[in-house]
Amino acid sequence: VNGAVFEEIARSVPIMILARHKNQLQQLEALLFGQAGLLEEEFTEQYPRLLQKEYRFLNRKYRLKKINGRPALLRMRPSAFPTVRLAQLAVFIQQSRHFFSVIRESEEIKDLYRMLDVTANDYWHYHYLFGETSAYRKKKLGRQMADSILINTVVPMLFALGHYHRMEAYKDKALRWLGSIRAESNNITEGFSRLGFPAGSAFDSQAFIQLKHVYCDARRCLDCVVGARLLRSVSR
């Protein structure tokens, strides 16, 4: 839902600025929330007011440009609110050490899961939005979200790196990691499962998603191995 907006936020804050402030969680949150347009209200709580003050200072210092959109909240589970995701991202940036090197050098995907084991700061245990208290719930990045990050970011990046540098070991590792991640569960994978093609891993579910977009949506059934098999079974 917020993919485009999050990309705008990422592009609006140079990575060197984030690196410069990575040891100060409040400053990281101020930069991310401020660029997302989430610090523009009049707050009564001390914490968002502190972030607001930090952001105004950092915004003037770095002359940051505001993004066009704002994160949406509609049709979202509270645990997936953009406020929670940005708070988790801030902690990840603070805790991460040489993440790209870990991707290249590690052979075990569990090392990546370990680095993605992040929990937002204490304020968010009692909030989903600024200024609105809620029952206590630890805002820990869930396994499903970690899977999604690995599937859609880490694995493609590692494979692309291997392709660019002609390093088959990176490409093989990317595919091996993809095969070790749980299959995604969505309308597309469930549809294939009903047709007799269950996804055993993220390797399968990504293949089904690609088939759906490239063949099913384009009505290229006769060019598709799965489509041809289904058509043969119907014609018998």
Which residue ranges define each predicted feature?
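Acidic, carboxylate-rich catalytic segments that either coordinate divalent cations
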Residues: 194-236
